[in-house]
Amino acid sequence: MPENENRQTVERLIQGLNERNLDLFHAQFHEDSVMEYPQSGERIVGGENRRAVYGAFPGLPTVTPRRIVVSGDVVVVEAVLDYGDGADWRAVFIFELRDGKVAKETAYWTQPFEAADWRAQWVERIDG
């Protein structure tokens, strides 16, 4: 698929999540899609499991993309996630698309942390 269509698929996915329109969110995935969370060692296989996880989610985040990069059938999103608890999370999502829908999503996320004092003399501070 053209890169602009792949980007639009991921943008609709984010829109669905942010609007709590899970039908729109799930429509962007293939039924046999896989979601992987390497940090927690989890893999969600297939639409039935994905719908169950998101249906049971105690508090879906609002996703604010900071950057979206597209290369062929791969879309990478750097984002800030707000779970409504006052703590922003930083995340990177790697979406692999097939025929205009997500076939695989790999997600990494963390909360901001204090910079180490030992390297302060060599770095510049940036806004998270």
Model features per residue range: what roles?
Residues 22-73:
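A solvent-exposed, acidic/Ser-Thr-rich amphipathic alpha-helical stretch
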